[in-house]
Amino acid sequence: RQVCPTGLDKIDSQDILRGGLGRGELGVVAANTGVGKSHFLVAMGCAAMRAGKNVIHYTFELSEHETGKRYDSNLCDIPSNEIIERKKEVVDKYEKMDLGKLIIKEYPSGSASVMTIRNHIEKLTLKGFKPSLVTVDYADVMKSSRAYDSLRHELKLIYTELRNLAGDLNKQIKILQNLTL
């Protein structure tokens, strides 16, 4: 079983995930708005990169630039609001690290479906980029491949298609979901 660590030792333990999320598995992070799900997803991507895994991070809320700053902040241990002014230090730190590669792709909310993501991954694979981990921030705002009267049914279809994508591509996919309680 090939795994990708979450970066959380307790969750990655042999008792729970046996080292991390396995290929073809779908991990869902669900919590209320504003508690740090996007930061957590970045932290999981960084843990995978530190383990030498290649990561694709799809973002539907933040820009590629802001998402990249979060990765830089996490990997270099520099506050994100200081990344730009400490650019030389960031570059120096990266030169000393042995990391997997990262691709960040931004789509406007409601514009990309699971098929869009599948096509993008296949295009990257043809160019030689082989991801071990795919992250989606947020699946809730993706475009459904079918219209339903109920949002619940559309979301169920999106999550089913993401799970199938993970299995078809033999990749770990981690997604975020907003909970409104």
Question: Residue locations for each model-derived region?
Answer:
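The Walker A/P-loop phosphate-binding site
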Residues: 1-78
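Cytosolic-facing regulatory segments adjacent to core modules
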Residues: 13-17, 52-130, 144
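A general structural motif
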Residues: 24, 52, 130-131, 170
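Structural motif
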Residues: 28, 132-135, 174
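Substrate-engagement module of ASCE P-loop NTPases
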Residues: 47-49, 154-181
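Short, contiguous acidic/charged loop-to-helix segments that flank catalytic cores in large enzymes
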Residues: 107-112, 142-157, 165
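Walker B catalytic acidic pair
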Residues: 138
